[in-house]
Regions:
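Conserved sequence signature across two-component system core domains
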Residues: 11, 37-39, 62
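Short, acidic, metal-binding catalytic loop of nucleotide-sugar glycosyltransferases
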Residues: 23-31
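Acidic helix N-cap motif at the loop->helix transition within catalytic regions
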Residues: 16-20, 43-51
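Hydrophobic helical membrane-anchoring modules
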Residues: 1-5, 10, 16, 20, ...
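Conserved donor nucleotide-binding strand/loop of the catalytic core
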Residues: 32-35, 46-78
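Acceptor/aglycone-binding surface of glycosyltransferases and processive sugar-polymer synthases
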Residues: 62-78, 83, 96-173, 199-219
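A conserved acidic beta->alpha catalytic loop
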Residues: 38-47, 91
Length: 232
């Protein structure tokens, strides 16, 4: 199969991590196209990306922070790869997993990094680990899904998946739960491979600046689950 690959990166205040993430992607994926969608970061993220000398780098700057879902859709529209992936901009250390993910696509439509299969682990603090597991298990129960880590958000897929499943361009991380659910429902073959969610990105996490914010986002995740069931 062709190995023309695009990785989409959504950024907001990632000045300290984006250069490392892009460098790691270049290191581990040959001739990869990167699409960076920045939501008007005030910290210098955009300037940092513009200084990176790499020919297959597309940069889009949005005037407002419109969320991960619409950033992903914008990245899809402007991608050229027949394999498309998503990686959090502060998780460059996980770029090392992409060669394995690419090889697994020979027998799958989507390859997903998972904390909840054998060999996977979540090394963040106990509150985050328990809360994430609770939301994930609730999602599996409501959606009757066999996917072990619906909220991972780190994946590669064949472009043909988009013929059956179009992401809904609203929301933040919960959009990916709905996307994976619909892809599974359409019969796409989804393989999960283990990864260890590292500790060192925790302070930069957008989904958990504090427990209250995390619980609020959890509510929107659950609301999105029921919307996914009834949305055509």
């Amino acid at each position: 199969m062709s190995k023309n690959i695009t990785i989409i990166l959504s950024t907001h205040n990632e000045e300290l991590s984006i250069d490392h993430t892009i460098s790691e992607l270049i290191k581990h994926i040959k001739d990869v196209e990167k699409v960076v969608v920045d939501d008007n970061s005030p910290d210098g993220t955009l300037e940092t990306v513009k200084k990176i000398n790499y020919p297959k780098l597309k940069i889009f700057n949005r005037e407002k922070n419109k969320g991960l879902a619409s950033a992903f859709l914008l990245g899809l529209i402007n991608s050229s790869g027949d394999i498309i992936g998503w990686l959090d901009s502060n998780m460059g250390s996980l770029a090392i997993k992409f060669p394995e993910m690419i090889s697994k696509l020979d027998n799958a439509d989507i390859v997903l990094l998972s904390r909840y299969v054998s060999g996977g682990r979540d090394d963040r603090n106990i509150i985050r680990v328990v809360a994430s597991r609770l939301i994930n298990n609730l999602a599996k129960f409501i959606l009757r899904s066999k996917i072990q880590d619906l909220s991972s958000g780190i994946f590669l897929m064949k472009r043909k998946v988009l013929l059956d499943v179009v992401p809904v361009a609203s929301g933040h991380g919960e959009f990916m739960v709905e996307f994976l659910y619909k892809a599974e429902k359409k019969g796409n073959n989804i393989i999960e491979i283990p990864y260890v969610h590292p500790v060192d990105i925790e302070e930069n996490s957008k989904s958990f600046p504090n427990l209250g914010r995390f619980l609020l986002l959890g509510f929107f995740y659950i609301l999105r689950l029921f919307q996914a069931i009834f949305r055509r």
